[in-house]
Amino acid sequence: AALSLKLFERGQSGSRLTEAGRDLLAEGEKVERAASTFESRAKAHQRGMAGSIRLTCIEILANMAVTPAIAEFRRQHPEVQIDLMVTDQPLDLQAGEADLAVRAVQTLPNSDLIARKIVDYDFALYCSRDYAERMGAPATIADLINHDLIGGDAGLDTVPAMIWMFEQVDGKAPVTRSNSMSNLVHAVRAGMGVAPLPCVVADADSRLVRCSECIESAVSTSYILLRRELKDTPRVRALIDFLVPYMQADMKTRLERGRQMREQQAANDGEPQDLSKFRPPA
């Protein structure tokens, strides 16, 4: 009224918006949405939720579970920005290179970092179907010396399952090395040789053949690590409380899928695979 602008006009069926009214209604809805966003952000700041988190993990975990978990988490908490730093080389959390880390290790480092366990990962030896057709799959520990072995480098060589495999072949040189677990999976798929892989990844891959039972002495455990001063930050707590059960459920689903895949493959091959002769000692 103060602008002498007519927003409604009367018709036979009642009042309706004028062209100016329709235009201003759209603008008013934008203002309402902006005000709602402003209020949500202000409340998020009050709760300590708004802000960013720098999370680091290796590529295979990022692709398998962490990225989907982040996507789901942000649908619930859009005010939290998560910067995912994907590298197979461990970043120094205590030096501030990242806020959180998801790492799979056999033993935790002696540090002031807080650790929360996620899941255990079993490893076994695998080769590709193509490699098995060309070279045969190793049937016993003693057979390993006669096969092409893929090694690790720059940290991957310290994975317990990798150490175990090369201990069985008296220092035989690998045909190639990789510093990435994700790339190691691809190298095995490509038929380059035999290597230890996480069962949760490899069992569900129809291109791979499992050569051994699980290497019981080489179980790795994934943890979320964080600096002690971040433990009471609401957005950090919320992410950890979401990520841990998400990854645990994902692991359970993938293991079941892998079990079904191996059973189906055995049925297709006409006989179950007997790994009893290739059972690494505990």
Cite the ranges covered by each PLM segment.
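A short LG(V/I)-centered, amphipathic sequence patch enriched
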Residues: A1-L17
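Alpha-helical linker/hinge and terminal dimerization helices associated
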Residues: A2, L24-Q46
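Hydrophobic residues within well-ordered alpha-helices
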Residues: T18-G21, L93, L144, H186-G191, ...
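C-terminal effector-binding regulatory domain of bacterial HTH transcription factors
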Residues: A26, C199, A204-R207, I215-A282
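Central regulatory/effector-binding core of bacterial HTH transcription factors
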Residues: G51-S111, R257-Q260, Q264
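Short, well-ordered beta-strand segments
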Residues: R54-T56, A101, I150, A195, ...
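A ligand-binding cleft/hinge motif common to bilobed small-molecule-binding domains
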Residues: L184-V209
